[in-house]
Amino acid sequence: MKVVILDTGCANLSSVTYAVQRLGYTPVVSREAEIVLQADKLFLPGVGTAQAAMNQLEERDLIALIKACTQPVLGICLGMQLLGTHSDESGGIPTLGIVDTPVKKMIDHGLPLPHMGWNQVIPKAGHRLFRDIDDGAYFYFVHSYAMPVCENTIAQANYGEAFTAALEKDNFFGVQFHPERSGAAGAQLLKNFLEM
């Protein structure tokens, strides 16, 4: 199986690579259209700001390439947020528009931002991305922006208010948390995605 991690120029490429390698796969980090389109599974990692990430995608000619993908794609953290229509960051940053929902700045509700640390994730019952993961398992988050709960939400978490922790739209999946930093539950989620 060809596993590709999209070279978005972001900082968590190596941690995602190592997490996939620990599961027995040999991922390739690439931004070459031919390699990306031939992938059986594709990871879209991202950390930092939506503006910087979209600039990187545009500079690397990846926007149309991502939208053309028909294989399963997993967006991680900012990679998931980029699947939405836009981010409220910096007055509004257009993103990929795969999921018809914006990403909004989290309201602090007296809690510190960014939301950083372990939080419980509640998936839709029986969803294949969460197969063999205990109900109410904890995953590791680092973010100040979040996608509201929407029709594509397959799991949610709460930090002052509910937000989308995972989503699915056609062949696109996204997780707001970092599975590569979430211990056994995160490893199982990556395994589930890779075995789809």
From Swiss-Prot:
Q: Which residues form the active site?
A: C77, H178, E180
A Gene Ontology molecular function term of the record = imidazoleglycerol-phosphate synthase activity
* InterPro entries in alphabetical order: Class_I_gatase-like (IPR029062), GATASE (IPR017926), Imidazole-glycPsynth_HisH (IPR010139)
Q: What Pfam families does this protein's entry cite?
A: GATase
Sorted alphabetically, the Gene Ontology BP terms of this entry are:
L-histidine biosynthetic process
| Reaction equations catalysed | 5-[(5-phospho-1-deoxy-D-ribulos-1-ylimino)methylamino]-1-(5-phospho-beta-D-ribosyl)imidazole-4-carboxamide + L-glutamine = D-erythro-1-(imidazol-4-yl)glycerol 3-phosphate + 5-amino-1-(5-phospho-beta-D-ribosyl)imidazole-4-carboxamide + L-glutamate + H(+); L-glutamine + H2O = L-glutamate + NH4(+)
Enzyme Commission number: 4.3.2.10, 3.5.1.2
- Highest taxon above the source species: Bacteria
Q: How does it assemble?
A: Heterodimer of HisH and HisF.
What the protein does comes down to:
IGPS catalyzes the conversion of PRFAR and glutamine to IGP, AICAR and glutamate. The HisH subunit catalyzes the hydrolysis of glutamine to glutamate and ammonia as part of the synthesis of IGP and AICAR. The resulting ammonia molecule is channeled to the active site of HisF.
Query: What's the protein called, per UniProt?
Result: Imidazole glycerol phosphate synthase subunit HisH
- Source species of the chain: Pectobacterium atrosepticum (strain SCRI 1043 / ATCC BAA-672) (Erwinia carotovora subsp. atroseptica)
Species lineage, top-down?
A: Bacteria, Pseudomonadati, Pseudomonadota, Gammaproteobacteria, Enterobacterales
**Gene designation per UniProt:** hisH
